């Protein structure tokens, strides 16, 4: 995972994330047409948009610059650049995102932050789901 300033490709590696989940969910609409000569139609559908999100967890560490950047962006509703790769030279998401944040404060154990990123075009850059 890489982070950066919105409207540019993220270049700062974030090595302190864990439990990353990427969700790609094609949104569909019906495309069924009438059958002919007494033949019932077969229901069909087509993709009209793609819903994408990324969830990850970070352990609270006040010296972690990436955690601070993510928390600041989430609190302000400001977009940031996010780049994900399936391996070091691989492909993945590249675009600007907005973040939501949940803070876990367990009675026992470590304090964590759970982030969810969703794409935005607010900074003028179209998201690429797998590039």
Where are these regions (language model features)?
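Secondary-structure boundary/capping motif
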Residues: 55-57, 79-83, 114-118
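Charged, amphipathic alpha-helical segments
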Residues: 52-69
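Short acidic, glycine-rich loop/turn motifs
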Residues: 2-8, 84-89, 119
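Solvent-exposed edge beta-strands and adjacent loop segments
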Residues: 1-57, 94-114
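Short, acidic/charged, Gly/Pro-enriched secondary-structure junctions
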Residues: 65-98
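Beta-strand elements of well-folded, non-transmembrane domains
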Residues: 26, 58-62, 86-88, 101-105, ...
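Short, surface-exposed beta-strand/loop "edge" segments at domain boundaries and coil↔beta transitions
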Residues: 8-11, 63-65, 88-95, 124-128
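Protruding loop/beta-arch "assembly-hinge" segments enriched in small, turn-prone residues
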Residues: 111-131
């Amino acid at each position: 995972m890489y982070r950066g300033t919105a409207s540019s490709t993220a270049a700062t590696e974030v090595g302190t994330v864990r439990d990353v989940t990427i969700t790609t969910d094609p949104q569909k609409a019906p495309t069924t047409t009438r059958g002919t000569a007494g033949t019932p139609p077969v229901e069909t559908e087509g993709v009209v948009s793609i819903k994408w999100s990324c969830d990850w967890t970070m352990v609270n560490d006040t010296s972690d610059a990436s955690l601070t950047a993510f928390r600041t962006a989430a609190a302000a509703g400001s977009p940031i650049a996010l780049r994900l790769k399936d391996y070091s030279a691989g492909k993945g998401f590249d675009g600007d995102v907005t973040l939501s944040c949940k803070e876990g404060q367990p009675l026992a154990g470590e304090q964590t932050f759970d982030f969810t990123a969703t794409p935005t075009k607010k900074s003028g850059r179209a998201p690429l789901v797998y590039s």
